[in-house]
């Protein structure tokens, strides 16, 4: 449904009251006249595609070489396969670990109770 000019003026006045201290009113009016939302989006996307942020450039070059995520993932998987993980489960004759751990009782039964 079409909006009346009264409702648009009311909305504009409310927004100026709420956010007017961030921008002077003459800047608000100039920006509103210069930009339409549909026209500004393609320009914004085109401008941002050419920008390169410093941390993006640094993340691609580590140690003077181009950074490739596939190579890092392959190296990580290779390291995991070459180094077996130690199983830290309970063993029947493991050492007493004291409070809040596994403790060997007098009769040789394992328990996880206190000190």
Curated annotation (Swiss-Prot):
Pfam families: ANP (PF00212)
Presence of keyword Disulfide bond: yes
Matches recorded under PROSITE patterns: NATRIURETIC_PEPTIDE (PS00263)
Keyword Disulfide bond found: yes
Chain spans, region Disordered: 24-49
Family from the record: Belongs to the natriuretic peptide family.
Protein's job: Hormone which may be vasoactive and natriuretic. Has a cGMP-stimulating activity.
Protein's name according to its UniProt entry: C-type natriuretic peptide prohormone
UniProt source species: Scyliorhinus canicula (Small-spotted catshark)
